[in-house]
Regions:
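FMN-binding flavodoxin-like domain, especially the glycine-rich phosphate-binding loop
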Residues: 1-66
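Short secondary-structure transition/capping segments
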Residues: 13-16, 22-30, 48-58, 89-100, 114, 142-143, 146-155
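Conserved short-loop catalytic and cofactor-binding motifs
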Residues: 23, 80-81, 110, 141-142
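Conserved active-site and cofactor/substrate-binding residues in soluble primary-metabolism enzymes
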Residues: 30-33, 84, 113
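A mid-sequence, solvent-exposed acidic-amphipathic segment
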Residues: 54-87, 91-94
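Iron-sulfur cluster-binding cysteine motifs and their immediate structural context
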Residues: 79, 88-107, 113, 117-134
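Long, positively charged, glycine-interspersed low-complexity recognition regions
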Residues: 125-155
C-alpha cells in the first residue's frame, strides 16, 4: 500500500535533451535522500501514496503503443561519417540488434528495445535517430561504463 515517485535524468533524447550535469547531480542527490526516506518508510510498514506528475501520467498512457512500436524503431537510426567502426554500439546493445559488417556498414535487425545505449555510448556521437538527435547531448549515468554494459549482457 505504498507508492513513490523519484525524478531521474531523462535519457530518451528523441523527445528532449538530457539535463545539464549540475542538474543531474542535484537529481542524483535528491534521489539518494528520497530513497533513504523510502527505505525507512518501508521498514516501518508505513502506507504512502504519491502520485506522478502530469507529464508522467500522460507518458503512462502512451507507453503501451510505444512499447509495441519499439522493435522496428531502429529503421530511423542513422550513422554519420564520424563513425570509426569501433564496435561499441554492437557491444552495448542488450538485444544484440546491431551487426557491424566487415565493410563497416551497420545493420539493425529490428529487435530494438529502445534503450538507446548504442546512441549514448558511441564515443563519436555518430549514431542518431534521423535529424532529431544530431545536436542533442548524450547521457550516460556517471557511474556506468561500457564495461558495465558488456557485463550486463554477459559478454
Amino acid at each position: 500500500n505504498a507508492s513513490w515517485w523519484i525524478q531521474m535524468p531523462d535519457n530518451y533524447i528523441p523527445l528532449s535533451a538530457p539535463p545539464a550535469v549540475p542538474e543531474q547531480k542535484k537529481m542524483f542527490e535528491d534521489a539518494k535522500n528520497k530513497a533513504a526516506a523510502i527505505a525507512q518508510a518501508v521498514n516501518n510498514r508505513q502506507e504512502h501514496k504519491e502520485g506522478m506528475c502530469l507529464s508522467g501520467r500522460l507518458m503512462g498512457l502512451a507507453y503501451g503503443p510505444f512499447i509495441k512500436s519499439l522493435p522496428a524503431s531502429d529503421k530511423k537510426f542513422t550513422v554519420s561519417a564520424n563513425c570509426t567502426k569501433c564496435g561499441i554500439c554492437v557491444s552495448v546493445c542488450p538485444a544484440d540488434n546491431i551487426l557491424l559488417h566487415e565493410h563497416g556498414k551497420h545493420e539493425w535487425l529490428h529487435q530494438c528495445e529502445g534503450c538507446l545505449a548504442c546512441l549514448h555510448y558511441c564515443p563519436e556521437e555518430a549514431i542518431n535517430i534521423g535529424k532529431k538527435t544530431e545536436l542533442r547531448p548524450r547521457y550516460r549515468h556517471p557511474k556506468s561504463a561500457v564495461s558495465d554494459m558488456k557485463q550486463q549482457k554477459g559478454d
